[in-house]
Amino acid sequence: MAGDLRQELLAYLHELDIRPVCAEHPEVFTVEEMMPHVQHLGGAHSKNLFLKDKKKKGLWLVSVLHDRQVNLNDLAKKLNLGSGNLRFADEASMLEKLKVGQGCATPLALFCDRGDVQFVLDAQFLEGGYERVYFHPMTNAATLGMTPQEFVTFLKKTGHDPIIIHFD
C-alpha cells in the first residue's frame, strides 16, 4: 500500500511540476534513526507530530525542524486551544485521514486528506534560507526533498493553507 501511495504522490507532484529529489534508506521510526541516513542532504529535515484536541474534534499535523522539542501545552496556546488540550492522535486516525501509520507521519500525506486535518508548519522551513525541505514520501524508507516554494505550492493545491508558527 505504501508503495502505491508513494507512486500516487510522485505522480501528483509531477502534475504540479515539482521535481523532488529522493534518498532511499532503511525503514526508520524516529528522527534519531533517520538522521545518519540523510544528514548528507543539505536542507531542513522534519519531525512530524499527528495530534488531536482533548475533545477529539480537531486533528493537526505539525511539522517542525528535526531537532526541535515541541511543548504541547505551548503549542495548544499558540493555536488558541488552551493549555493541556493537545495530545497525540491514535494510529487508526492517522491511517484513516492520511493513509500512513506510525513512523510515517508526513505533510506529503495531506494529498490524501479531505479537509479534516489542519497543518501547522515551523516558520523556519520557510524563513531559514534552506535550499530544500525534506519529508517522508508516504513511507519511512525514503526521504524526499523539494524547495520551500514547491512545498508551499503542494500544500495550497491540497487545500491546506499552513498555520505558520515560530517555535523559537
From Swiss-Prot:
- Which superkingdom is the protein from? Eukaryota
**Signal peptide feature range:** none
> Where, if anywhere, are coiled coils annotated?
none
Which Pfam families did the record assign? tRNA_edit (PF04073)
Q: Which GO terms describe its molecular function?
A: aminoacyl-tRNA deacylase activity
Q: Which family does it belong to?
A: Belongs to the PRORSD1 family.
Q: Which PANTHER family match?
A: PROLYL-TRNA SYNTHETASE ASSOCIATED DOMAIN-CONTAINING PROTEIN 1-RELATED, YBAK DOMAIN-CONTAINING PROTEIN
What's the protein called, per UniProt?
Prolyl-tRNA synthetase associated domain-containing protein 1
Q: Which gene encodes it?
A: prorsd1p
